[in-house]
């Protein structure tokens, strides 16, 4: 049944399926934070979130020594950087992060890109592009 309400829901659904914003999440080595931050600022990024995280991938932890004893650290310290950007800026941001974070060694990290349906700035109520 074609009602105004059902058309409105369809519009919301269409907008969600064709999100024009993306969330870029990068897991990097902690000592690369300043390099990545500078690269993002130079790429025009004005805001980011940084979180301390722990994990492992192919690196599978590492052996450490403490007072003569060896033990395995299964989860390695990493940082997660998150930015939400207009879809048109994804390649620039991803390339900036990858270049700045790369050492060429196992454990350099990963970059994940996800669609973002809606952004709301809490203080003003601005939405989507205006909230970025």
Residue ranges and their predicted role:
Residues 17-132:
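Positively charged, small/polar-rich N-terminal and surface patches that mediate targeting and assembly
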Residues 1-16:
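Single conserved hydrophobic/aromatic residue that forms the stacking wall/gate
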């Amino acid at each position: 049944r074609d009602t105004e309400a059902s058309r409105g829901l369809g519009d919301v659904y269409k907008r969600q399926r064709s999100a024009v914003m993306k969330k870029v999440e990068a897991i990097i080595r902690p000592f690369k934070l300043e390099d990545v931050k500078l690269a993002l600022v130079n790429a025009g990024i004005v805001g980011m979130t940084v979180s301390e995280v722990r994990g492992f991938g192919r690196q599978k932890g590492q052996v450490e020594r403490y007072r003569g004893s060896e033990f395995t650290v299964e989860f390695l310290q990493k940082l997660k950087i998150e930015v939400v950007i207009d879809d048109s800026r994804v390649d620039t941001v991803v390339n900036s992060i990858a270049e700045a974070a790369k050492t060429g060694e196992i454990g350099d990290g990963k970059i994940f890109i996800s669609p973002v349906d809606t952004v709301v700035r809490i203080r003003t109520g601005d939405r989507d592009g205006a909230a970025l």
